[in-house]
Every structure is written in C-alpha cells, then in structure tokens.
UniProtKB/Swiss-Prot annotation:
The chain crosses the membrane at residues 27-49. It is a single-pass membrane protein. It is found in: Plastid, Chloroplast thylakoid membrane. Belongs to the ATPase B chain family. HAMAP family: ATP_synth_b_bprime. The lineage of its organism: Eukaryota, Viridiplantae, Streptophyta, Embryophyta, Tracheophyta. In plastids the F-type ATPase is also known as CF(1)CF(0). Keywords: ATP synthesis, CF(0), Chloroplast, Hydrogen ion transport, Ion transport, Membrane, Plastid, Thylakoid, Transmembrane, Transmembrane helix, Transport. One of its GO terms (cellular component) is proton-transporting ATP synthase complex. F(1)F(0) ATP synthase produces ATP from ADP in the presence of a proton or sodium gradient. F-type ATPases consist of two structural domains, F(1) containing the extramembraneous catalytic core and F(0) containing the membrane proton channel, linked together by a central stalk and a peripheral stalk. During catalysis, ATP synthesis in the catalytic domain of F(1) is coupled via a rotary mechanism of the central stalk subunits to proton translocation. This is ATP synthase subunit b, chloroplastic. F-type ATPases have 2 components, F(1) - the catalytic core - and F(0) - the membrane proton channel. F(1) has five subunits: alpha(3), beta(3), gamma(1), delta(1), epsilon(1). F(0) has four main subunits: a(1), b(1), b'(1) and c(10-14). The alpha and beta chains form an alternating ring which encloses part of the gamma chain. F(1) is attached to F(0) by a central stalk formed by the gamma and epsilon chains, while a peripheral stalk is formed by the delta, b and b' chains. The gene is atpF. One of its GO terms (molecular function) is proton-transporting ATP synthase activity, rotational mechanism.
Amino acid sequence: MKKVTDSFVSLGHWPSAGSFGFNTDILATNPINLSVVLGVLIFFGKGVLSDLLDNRKQRILSTIRNSEELRGGAIEKLEKAKARLRKVKAEADEFRTNGYSEIEREKCNLINSTYQNLERLENYKNETIQFEQQRAINQVRQRIFQQALQGALGTLNSCLNNELHLRTISANIGMFGAMKEIT
C-alpha cells in the first residue's frame, strides 16, 4: 500500500501545468492585446466584410435582373411563337379549306368538261350518222335513177324503130321551130 500513497504524494510535488479556473492576472492573459486585435479586426473587417457583402448582394441583384430580363425575353419569344403558331394554324386551315374547295371546283370543272366532250361526241356521232344516211339515200336514189334510165332506154330502144324515131325527131324539130318564132 505504500506504493499507492507514494504516488499520491508525488503528485502533490509536481509543478502546476495549468488548472481549471480563472486567471486574474491581466498581463498574463493578454486581454488588452486580444481586445486591440479584435477591435482592429472589427473596425477594418467591418468595411471589408461590408464591401464583400455589398458586392455579393450586387452580383445577386444583377443576376436576378438578368434572369428577369431573360425571363421577360423568353416570355416575349414564347408569345411571338404562340402568335406565329396560331397564324400558321389559321393559314393551314385556310389552305385546307381552299384546297378542298379548289378540289371540288376542279372536280366540277372536270365533270362539266367531260359532259361537254360527251355531248360534242354525241353530236358528232349523230351528224356522222345523218351524213352517212344521206349519202346512202343519195346512192340508192342514184342507183334507182340509173336503173330507171337504163330501163327506159331499154324500153325505148326496144319500142322505137326507125320510122318512130324519125317522127319523134321531126316533132321535136317542129317544136324548136315554133319556139324560135315565139322568141
């Protein structure tokens, strides 16, 4: 047990390295130096810190202003784009409507043109048929007339003899002579 008590005794002889408690010696603790340093830091640091904070504030405000300007520009561009989109949609609807009406108009024109062509072809066909009928009728008439003439000549040639022929010629000469006297 002697060893334990010796160790406590030896603790009492060590020099004091520092202890908890307040040191009331002003020069030993340097509160004047600390207060001067703190005062200088506060006095000069306040301006520097204020300048740093003002610069930071100005950068933040300019960033906000720039952001607002960009936002305003973006909103303006968006409105322009929306207006242009509405305009393009209206033009597309107009083109679509005009396109449909143009298609309908062309369709009607094509139908009318086709009917006119068909009517013209029908008239041409009817004229051709009438012409061919008239030509056939004329050919038939000509043949009938030729056959009638041939038949009449055949009848006359078979019926006429020289004496009848001479009498007919004399009668015709007499008629020409009478006509000559009248004129």
